[in-house]
């Protein structure tokens, strides 16, 4: 199927003056959250209102929402995993593992038990072997290595709908790999090989196990099928509507796309339903 070229008539630009949003996530009521390059968390409600929840003073990459309405985010500026309450209060949950500071904390998600998985991308320029890894952080803010990798700039992560696998985008390898959740440091398997020159960033699973892939380069959204094939879903050769797209959130029949190079989110109607998103209530982490 040929890729759809985005135009102003087939997509919506959401948000005004967002500060180069790298990540986006959805609340259970459809509220949209996005991060900014000065540590901002924006809330965009279903009626079109836009509100600045708070700032961390850093640079926010991946973010996700818990069951109490708090945002958890990778703050690469402060090299920390942070939590922002619905009122905007910021606390640092972790800054590294056993004396090993984070280098590039990049993306996060919760599993059904409330454990948070985090990619530390490592050194972008160490492209022969990579230095990235995957960590876990429990509800008491204890961080440890889950998979030592090394990953080649471990970026976006997504939990397979079966709950058995964690998928990771390797930006400098132009591929997607998976690791078993039941086996720390378990075998790493390439599931999707992307076209040469592609820089995958964020990934998100649909309920039918299709994997939506945001590409920092080119300005395109890909879909990875369960059989390992990959096709381009949307593209924007102008770089105006999609501008360095990074992370993606799947809504009911819509994709919400963060544009690190721009000032808005892009919303496109598409034949996708979201895989389960886990938003645990972390009472121990309450401010």
What is the predicted function of each stretch?
Residues 37, 76-77, 125-132, 171-173, ...:
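Short, solvent-exposed loop/turn segments at conserved positions within beta-propeller repeat blades
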Residues 175, 192-229:
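Loop/turn-rich, solvent-exposed surfaces of beta-rich toroidal or solenoidal domains
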Residues 9-15, 48-54, 90-98, 142-148, ...:
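A short beta-strand motif characteristic of beta-propeller blades
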Residues 44-49, 85-89, 137-141, 180-184, ...:
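Short loop/turn segments that connect beta-strands within beta-propeller blades
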Residues 40-42, 80-82, 132-135, 175-177, ...:
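A short loop-to-beta-strand structural motif that recurs across blades of beta-propeller domains
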Residues 1-9, 37-38, 127-129:
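Blade/loop signatures of beta-propeller domains
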Residues 33-52:
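Beta-propeller domains
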Residues 16-29, 38, 56-75, 98-119, ...:
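Beta-rich, blade/repeat-based domains predominating
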């Amino acid at each position: 199927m040929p890729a759809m070229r985005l135009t102003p008539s087939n997509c919506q630009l959401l948000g005004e003056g967002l500060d180069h949003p790298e990540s986006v996530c959805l609340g259970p009521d459809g509220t949209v959250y996005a991060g900014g390059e000065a540590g901002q968390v924006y809330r965009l409600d279903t009626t079109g209102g836009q509100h600045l929840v708070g700032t961390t003073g850093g640079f926010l990459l991946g973010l996700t929402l818990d069951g109490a309405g708090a945002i958890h985010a990778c703050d690469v500026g402060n090299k920390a995993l942070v939590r922002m309450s619905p009122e905007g209060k910021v606390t640092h949950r972790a800054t590294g593992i056993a004396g090993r500071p984070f280098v590039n904390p990049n993306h996060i998600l919760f599993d059904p038990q409330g454990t948070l998985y985090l990619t530390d991308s490592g050194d972008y320029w160490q492209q022969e072997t990579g230095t990235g890894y995957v960590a876990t952080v429990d509800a008491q803010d204890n961080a440890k290595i889950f998979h030592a990798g090394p990953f080649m700039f471990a970026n976006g992560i997504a939990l397979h709908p079966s709950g058995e696998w964690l998928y990771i985008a390797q930006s400098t390898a132009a591929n997607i790999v998976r690791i078993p959740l039941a086996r720390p440091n378990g075998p790493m398997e390439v599931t999707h090989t992307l076209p040469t020159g592609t820089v995958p960033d964020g990934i998100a699973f649909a309920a039918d196990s299709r994997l939506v892939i945001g590409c920092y380069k080119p300005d395109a959204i890909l879909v990875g099928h369960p059989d390992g094939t990959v096709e381009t879903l949307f593209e924007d050769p102008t770089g105006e509507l999609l501008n360095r797209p990074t992370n993606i959130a799947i809504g009911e029949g819509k994709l919400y796309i963060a544009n690190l190079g721009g000032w808005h989110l892009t919303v496109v109607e598409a034949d996708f339903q979201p895989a389960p998103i886990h938003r645990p209530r972390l009472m121990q982490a309450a401010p």
